[in-house]
Curated annotation (Swiss-Prot):
Family (UniProt): Belongs to the universal ribosomal protein uL24 family.
Keyword Transmembrane helix assigned: no
Name of the coding gene: rplX
Keyword Ribonucleoprotein: yes
The protein's name in its UniProt record: Large ribosomal subunit protein uL24
């Protein structure tokens, strides 16, 4: 099955502490989760490692978000949208269901 949300897609968060915020997908995990740039930030306590030159402290990093809690953002309508698939010229392409425009 093809992925409806892929890397570099702009998504909007539907549920959770970052609800309503938008960002680009930086990574799609095989567990059905996404990492979105600048969203779902958590604080991680980093242990210092002098061999690698890593300073210790509290570091903010992006945590995965469940794919069902985000939707692809349609810049033409300015809203969250659903994705469908169709064949054009023998290739499978993604399109927005609200206005039938191709994704990217």
């Amino acid at each position: 099955m093809a992925a409806k949300i892929r890397r570099q897609d702009e998504v909007i968060v539907l549920a959770g502490k970052d609800q309503g915020k938008r960002g680009k997908v930086s990574q799609v995990l095989p567990t059905g989760k996404l990492i979105v740039e600048g969203l779902n930030l958590v604080k991680k306590h980093q242990k210092p490692n002098p061999q690698l030159g890593v300073a210790g402290g509290i570091v903010e990093q992006e945590a995965p978000i469940q794919a069902s809690n985000v939707a692809i953002f349609n810049s033409a309508t300015g809203k969250a949208d659903r994705v469908g698939f169709r064949f054009e010229d023998g290739k499978k392409v993604r399109f927005f269901k609200s206005n039938s425009e191709l994704v990217k």
